[in-house]
A protein has these predicted regions:
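Anionic coordination/interaction segments
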Residues: 1-280
């Protein structure tokens, strides 16, 4: 039930090859979160669909939140605070998008630009709000379970520029009549220049962009499964195994004593069919 930890009346999670889907029901309100990675662009969409099964009009406030790094996982793990010092943010009001870039420390370092935007299908109320300062969003001594910007009902500060700990946060307020559903798609896109990232923002700032990404993701998933000759159940097992290989989960690792006993010279690998001619 992340991030709030509040148990709903009903909850369900479905992972498929093309998307992840989270469904929860709280009273008369049902929320569906669909997460899809675009096959054609460096873009991810998280669409929130809110349905009102009650007898009265509801006004719902939706707030996104993501912590920014714009660096490799290794660089962030080694020096997380230092890595984030070089991120600058700005807001492009005409597109309703937050932009962020990492200041290069040398001309040889490649540019990295990211953008975050929201596309609303339904009736909006109030003005869009943004935040790019993590401290202002979370508050002193708080975390994502109880951020002050959400729990206290205060507006976002619309802070941009050079911040010590950057985030992407967008807020939209929607009005949902009885028996109706409103969709809000939160897009995050990445490119190698400001011009390119603005082009991606323009491309995805449309209500049809989600359907296109969903169709392409499903099609690509079916083609991959057919090409590999595996069914969805087998693909799920392979992905779980790949996760342990890529991220080296400690729970799957033998004890240090077992690893030391397995040490030896390269000839010890030859009996296993591993050599310079047949590398891993």
């Amino acid at each position: 039930y992340q991030p709030s930890g509040v148990e709903p009346d009903r909850y369900g999670v479905t992972f498929t090859e093309d998307r992840a889907e989270f469904v929860r029901r709280d009273g008369a309100i049902t929320t569906i979160l669909e997460v899809i990675v675009s096959p054609e662009n460096d873009a991810e969409v998280r669409r929130v669909s809110v349905s009102n099964a009650g007898a009265r009009v509801r006004e719902i406030e939706l707030t996104s939140y993501a912590e920014l790094v714009l660096a490799t996982p290794a660089a962030d793990a080694a020096h997380p605070a230092f890595s984030r010092l070089f991120v600058q943010t700005e807001y492009v009001a005409r597109m309703g998008a937050i932009l962020a870039t990492r200041r290069r420390r040398s001309p040889a370092e490649p540019e990295t630009w990211a953008a975050h935007l929201a596309v609303v299908e339904g009736e909006e109320t109030g003005e869009p709000e943004i935040e790019t300062d993590r401290a202002r969003f979370l508050g002193r001594g708080r975390d994502v379970r109880d951020p002050i910007a959400v729990m206290d009902g205060r507006p976002l500060s619309n802070t941009v520029g050079t911040v010590l700990d950057p985030v992407f946060a967008l807020r939209r307020r929607v009005r949902i009549p009885p028996g109706r559903t409103v969709h809000v798609a939160f897009w995050t896109v990445v490119a190698s220049s400001r011009t390119d990232v603005l082009d991606l923002v323009d491309k995805h700032h449309d209500t049809t962009a989600f359907d296109r990404a969903a169709t392409l993701a499903w099609t690509q998933a079916q083609v991959q499964l057919s090409h590999l000759g595996v069914d969805p159940e087998e693909a799920n097992l392979f992905q779980r195994l790949a996760g342990h290989l890529i991220y080296a989960g400690p729970g799957m690792r033998p004890s240090s004593g077992t690893i030391r006993r397995g040490g030896g010279a390269p000839p010890g690998l030859w009996s296993q069919g591993i050599s310079g001619d047949l590398p891993i």
